[in-house]
């Protein structure tokens, strides 16, 4: 306590924390007790190899600050708990404003706390590429989301699955106009309130609803995607690009609480990056397989993924599919192209000569598919930071194409509406300035009683439009399956009532 008071008196943030045994508590149960819709709360989880849950899960609650941006116009609401309309424009351009906020949220962390700490959590939408590249964008924006949004939680819960331990953490931010002891007392009170709610023996009653099974309505008219594929192939034939990823949106009614969709998705399609962001006005719910950029201890990491086969029903079928995948020249060529992109992207923010491919052409298993994966690392240059590393490789080649800038130009020309969160990044900044992010894939935007899912296919010279259309539908199908499972579960509860 004395150390925290001294830090606050010196104008430095402090982390007020406690830990408790959590062998009977789960992240989902805690989220059901604690998350309030639309407040900016979140749950982050991970599943490796489609079967092994990650060591740490993170819940963030009751933000005191919300940052959002549209293009170069950023705004911060520092009175979020009291007035959700109190956004004030930032005087700097968007990335400068975000960089200043990340710096202001830097804090010393007790070495006894896990590394999986967050101070700012949110997303970068695809259109934020316009902050670093001069690209025209479609004017149609049916979802109307901010280009980026980040929240700063006042309470964090970090579950350590290996140690059966729960860390309760309340950041205490300095205010030289206030007594540090009052700031610490408020942080302790927040922890007391959360601990009391966690101790409640009963979960909220199951959601009960008798609603029709959802089905998708495509945003594109029949045949329109095929026309987009044909136009892209003309650009490929002309030598403009080697590949471009063209996406489309599917929508379906969904009137259940967004967290019910997340509960189903994490079971049906577990992935390394699972997230439920219950943001003001909408929710982002996803199960992404692919890292976007990680910056930790001065090291940049990117992991290009390209090349896919379904999982087999047996170990022998898995091995046969793995062998087939690695022997496929088209899959290997596509992966090599994206691996080269990853090396180039990392190199733009790296110390000269530090880029390394530490794993190449490794097959990783996920819940329903297997992918070819490579790993690229580099030392962050002394004059660069995590945001530089993020936008050196933004957007990822796996959701844009190659060469990247020309592919993005063609995407803006051929896709009829803005992508929004899709193909951007979900992630968090840690108190030490680290960044962990994933590509927004297999993700739903839940807004106004509707789920919106975008999915794309990589278009190359020999692409067949009908096949690429089916690939988009199949990728979007994981979210639809989760929505149907959630509706079915709610219907069973209603029937049982």
Each PLM stretch: what is its role?
Residues 1-497:
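Extended alpha-helical targeting/anchoring segments
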């Amino acid at each position: 306590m004395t150390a925290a008071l001294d830090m606050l008196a010196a104008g430095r943030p402090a982390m007020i924390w406690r830990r408790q045994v959590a062998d009977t508590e789960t992240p989902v149960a805690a989220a059901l007790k604690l998350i309030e819709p639309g407040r900016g709360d979140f749950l982050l989880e991970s599943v490796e190899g489609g079967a092994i849950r990650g060591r740490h899960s993170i819940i963030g609650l009751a933000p005191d600050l919300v940052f959002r941006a549209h293009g170069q116009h950023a705004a911060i609401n520092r009175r979020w708990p009291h007035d959700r309309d109190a956004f004030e424009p930032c005087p700097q351009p968007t990335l400068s404003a975000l960089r200043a906020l990340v710096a202001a949220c830097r804090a010393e962390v007790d070495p006894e706390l896990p590394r999986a700490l967050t101070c700012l959590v949110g997303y970068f939408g695809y259109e934020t590429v316009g902050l670093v590249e001069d690209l025209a964008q479609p004017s149609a924006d049916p979802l109307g989301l901010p280009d980026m949004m980040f929240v700063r939680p006042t309470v964090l819960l970090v579950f350590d699955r290996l140690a059966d331990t729960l860390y309760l953490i309340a950041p205490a931010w300095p205010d030289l106009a206030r007594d540090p002891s009052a700031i610490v007392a408020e942080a302790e009170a927040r922890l007391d309130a959360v601990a009391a709610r966690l101790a409640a023996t009963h979960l909220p009653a199951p959601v009960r609803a008798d609603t029709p099974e959802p089905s998708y309505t495509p945003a594109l008219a029949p045949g329109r995607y095929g026309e987009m594929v044909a136009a892209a192939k003309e650009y490929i034939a002309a030598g403009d690009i080697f590949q471009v990823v063209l996406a489309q949106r599917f929508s379906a009614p969904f009137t259940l609480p967004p967290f019910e969709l997340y509960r189903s998705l994490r079971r049906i399609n577990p992935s390394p990056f699972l997230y439920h962001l219950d943001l003001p006005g909408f929710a982002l719910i996803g199960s992404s397989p692919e890292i976007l950029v990680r910056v930790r201890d001065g090291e940049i990491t990117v992991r290009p993924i390209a090349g896919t086969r379904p999982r087999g029903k047996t170990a022998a079928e898995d091995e046969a599919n793995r062998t087939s995948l690695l022997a496929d020249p088209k899959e290997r060529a596509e992966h090599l192209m994206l691996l080269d992109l990853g090396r180039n992207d990392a190199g733009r923010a790296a110390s000269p000569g530090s880029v390394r491919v530490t794993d190449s052409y490794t097959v990783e298993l996920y819940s329903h598919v297997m992918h070819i994966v490579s790993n690229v690392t580099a030392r962050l240059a002394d004059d660069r930071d995590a945001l530089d590393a993020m936008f050196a490789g933004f957007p990822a080649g796996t959701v844009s194409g190659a060469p990247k800038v020309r592919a993005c130009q063609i995407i803006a020309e051929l896709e009829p509406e803005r992508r929004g969160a899709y193909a951007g990044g979900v992630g968090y900044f840690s108190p030490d300035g680290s960044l962990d992010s994933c590509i927004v894939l297999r993700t739903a935007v839940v807004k106004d009683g509707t789920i919106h899912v975008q999915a794309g296919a990589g278009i190359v010279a020999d692409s067949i439009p009908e096949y690429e259309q089916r690939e988009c539908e199949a990728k979007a199908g994981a979210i639809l399956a989760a929505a149907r499972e959630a509706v079915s579960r709610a219907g069973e509860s209603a029937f049982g009532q």
